């Protein structure tokens, strides 16, 4: 697997950051998770006065061979149709990114459609969708490696343009099924507790999805498959998930703040953090999704999400919605008065 130089942020500033937070005109801990977020960002940037510069949202899109087997309520064509919707500015992520001042790019990591050259679209296509993992590995090791390299290159270009905070989103019919398999393999949670309704499967559809995923697992185990993060990514992942893994690793290497969305983005973060555990020190977990298995993902990563809105859309919507809270964490640290500067008496 690839080599990324990801170091745990130097904790030398931690006491000074905590003291700065504690001297603000408020009771200790009164800003809750915003205080932890402010401290995390200060440590990532190694400063008492962090800044969020050129914030960008990346939406990674890819098709899944297993979608044709019936793991989703929607036809595979919806992937490319939604990419067109993103490019036209009409999706939920477009609305929230515009509202909150986030730049937005769509990454074609492996959609089964030819988009040509388009403004706002990054061509990082490994292939026109993965293979059907119910019958064979979703991708070859070489394809998986290529996707990771592609993602890293995209983020390095953003870093060169002064971006120090990046949000992750995705689109791919069938990718909740893929994320369910990855979550099961990496956390040990029973598959049934990792499999949800995705885009809205009825009871029969949910049972069929679970049965198909059990078949995929049996095939993999019978072939001697293990739970190594890189191996399960190639076996069950999507090109959008693998490309996202590379992007996350490069973002942490560049000491950027990573805005982690929901269940599918969470599966990429789970993989990336198994490959480089220090990555978690750079992640802000934006929300707890309504999708089955996301709670276990968050527990496995020791994550405290900022929001719990019952979201299950994907696209990076939870990350975009949480971004103003991240801004608020930085703003209170930089702008709020201390007891001393405001002439306010602290408690006895």
UniProtKB/Swiss-Prot annotation:
It catalyses: 5,6-dimethylbenzimidazole + nicotinate beta-D-ribonucleotide = alpha-ribazole 5'-phosphate + nicotinate + H(+). The gene is cobT. GO terms for biological process: cobalamin biosynthetic process. It is an enzyme of class 2 (transferase). Keywords: Cobalamin biosynthesis, Glycosyltransferase, Transferase. NCBIfam families: cobT_DBIPRT (TIGR03160), PRK00105.1 (NF000996). Belongs to the CobT family. PANTHER family: NICOTINATE-NUCLEOTIDE--DIMETHYLBENZIMIDAZOLE PHOSPHORIBOSYLTRANSFERASE (PTHR43463:SF1). Catalyzes the synthesis of alpha-ribazole-5'-phosphate from nicotinate mononucleotide (NAMN) and 5,6-dimethylbenzimidazole (DMB). One of its GO terms (molecular function) is nicotinate-nucleotide-dimethylbenzimidazole phosphoribosyltransferase activity. Pathway: Nucleoside biosynthesis; alpha-ribazole biosynthesis; alpha-ribazole from 5,6-dimethylbenzimidazole: step 1/2. Gene3D superfamilies: 1.10.1610.10, 3.40.50.10210. InterPro entries: Nict_dMeBzImd_PRibTrfase (IPR003200), Nict_dMeBzImd_PRibTrfase_bact (IPR017846), Nict_dMeBzImd_PRibTrfase_N (IPR023195), Nict_dMeBzImd_PRibTrfase_sf (IPR036087). The active site is at 315 (proton acceptor). This is Nicotinate-nucleotide--dimethylbenzimidazole phosphoribosyltransferase. SUPFAM superfamilies: Nicotinate mononucleotide:5,6-dimethylbenzimidazole phosphoribosyltransferase (CobT). It comes from Dechloromonas aromatica (strain RCB). Its EC number is 2.4.2.21.
């Amino acid at each position: 697997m690839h080599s990324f130089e990801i170091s745990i942020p130097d904790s030398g500033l931690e006491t000074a950051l905590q003291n700065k937070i504690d001297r603000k005109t408020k009771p200790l801990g009164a800003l809750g998770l915003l205080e932890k977020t402010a401290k995390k960002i200060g440590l990532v940037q190694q400063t008492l006065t962090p800044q969020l510069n050129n914030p960008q949202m990346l939406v990674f899109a890819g098709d899944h061979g297993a979608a044709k087997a019936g793991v989703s309520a929607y036809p595979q064509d919806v992937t490319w149709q939604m990419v067109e919707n993103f490019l036209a500015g009409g999706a939920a992520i477009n609305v929230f990114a515009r509202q909150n001042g986030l730049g937005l790019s769509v990454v074609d990591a492996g959609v089964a459609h030819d988009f040509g050259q388009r403004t706002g679209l990054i061509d990082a296509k490994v292939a026109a969708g993965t293979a059907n993992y119910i019958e064979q590995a979703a991708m070859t090791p070489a394809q998986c490696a290529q996707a990771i390299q592609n993602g890293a290159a995209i983020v390095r270009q953003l870093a060169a343009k002064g971006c120090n905070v990046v949000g992750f989103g995705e689109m791919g019919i069938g990718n909740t099924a893929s994320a369910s398999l990855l979550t099961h393999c990496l956390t040990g949670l029973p598959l049934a507790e990792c499999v949800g309704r995705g885009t809205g499967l009825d009871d029969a559809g949910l049972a069929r999805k679970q049965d198909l995923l059990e078949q995929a697992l049996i095939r993999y185990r019978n072939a001697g498959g293990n739970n190594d993060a890189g191996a399960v990514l190639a076996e069950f992942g999507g090109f959008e998930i693998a490309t996202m893994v590379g992007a996350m690793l490069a973002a942490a290497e560049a000491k950027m703040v990573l805005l982690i969305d929901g269940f599918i983005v969470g599966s990429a973060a789970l993989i990336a953090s198994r490959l480089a555990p220090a990555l978690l020190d750079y992640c802000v977990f934006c929300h707890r999704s309504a999708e089955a298995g996301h709670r276990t993902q968050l527990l496995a990563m020791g994550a405290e999400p900022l929001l719990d809105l019952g979201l299950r859309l994907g696209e990076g919507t939870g990350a975009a919605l949480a971004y103003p809270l991240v801004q608020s964490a930085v703003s209170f640290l930089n702008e709020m008065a201390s007891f001393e500067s405001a002439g306010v008496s602290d408690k006895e």
